[in-house]
């Protein structure tokens, strides 16, 4: 049985479309509001946090590596997240109790590549860009 095609079927077509929208993953995520509640950033693109500890996350098979990450407690809501530290040796620029700026890591709330459960990356440390520190253009402020 196909869809209604006659005259006076507009109400039926419209209500059917309204019902079927909710079976679309993206529509449901955007309109229910539960994804926004579950998101540690609360809809923002970036968030500041305090480094709790440095952790090594093992890469998924078939890769074999320890990806350098940090546990961060967000200032705005106190939620704890794991954030990836990009580039070689950048973990040395980060100490515990540092203030870091964290951003998303690519796939709209999903983990990236072979790093399981890590959905965020570190962008700034003590208000200095991690990339600038890595390239040697800037130095960490002495405190």
From Swiss-Prot:
Annotated protein name in UniProt: Small ribosomal subunit protein uS12
Record Gene3D superfamilies: Nucleic acid-binding proteins (2.40.50.140)
Disease tied to this protein: Brachycephaly, trichomegaly, and developmental delay: An autosomal dominant developmental disorder characterized by brachycephaly, ciliary trichomegaly, dysmorphic features of the face and hands, hearing loss, and developmental delay with short stature. Intellectual disability and autism spectrum disorder may be present in some patients.
PTM characteristics: Hydroxylation at Pro-62 affects translation termination efficiency.
Subunit field text: Component of the 40S small ribosomal subunit. Part of the small subunit (SSU) processome, composed of more than 70 proteins and the RNA chaperone small nucleolar RNA (snoRNA) U3.
Family per similarity comment: Belongs to the universal ribosomal protein uS12 family.
Composition bias, Basic residues: 1-20
Compartments where located: Cytoplasm, Cytosol; Cytoplasm; Rough endoplasmic reticulum; Nucleus, Nucleolus
N6-acetyllysine PTM sites in chain numbering: 135
Top-level taxonomic group: Eukaryota
InterPro entries: NA-bd_OB-fold, Ribosomal_uS12, Ribosomal_uS12_euk/arc
Modified residues (3-hydroxyproline): 62
Covalent cross-link site, Glycyl lysine isopeptide (Lys-Gly) (interchain with G-Cter in SUMO2): 37
UniProt-recorded Gene Ontology molecular function terms: RNA binding; structural constituent of ribosome
Function, as annotated: Component of the ribosome, a large ribonucleoprotein complex responsible for the synthesis of proteins in the cell. The small ribosomal subunit (SSU) binds messenger RNAs (mRNAs) and translates the encoded message by selecting cognate aminoacyl-transfer RNA (tRNA) molecules. The large subunit (LSU) contains the ribosomal catalytic site termed the peptidyl transferase center (PTC), which catalyzes the formation of peptide bonds, thereby polymerizing the amino acids delivered by tRNAs into a polypeptide chain.
PANTHER family on file: 30S RIBOSOMAL PROTEIN S12 FAMILY MEMBER
Entry keyword set: Acetylation, Cytoplasm, Deafness, Disease variant, Dwarfism, Endoplasmic reticulum, Hydroxylation, Isopeptide bond, Nucleus, Ribonucleoprotein, Ribosomal protein, Ubl conjugation
GO CC terms in record: cytoplasm; cytosol; cytosolic ribosome; cytosolic small ribosomal subunit; endoplasmic reticulum; membrane; nucleolus; nucleoplasm
Organism expressing this protein natively: Homo sapiens
Pfam families: Ribosom_S12_S23 (PF00164)
Biological process per Gene Ontology, one example term: ribosomal small subunit biogenesis
Positions of post-translational N6-succinyllysine modification: 54
Chain intervals for the UniProt region annotation (Disordered): 1-26
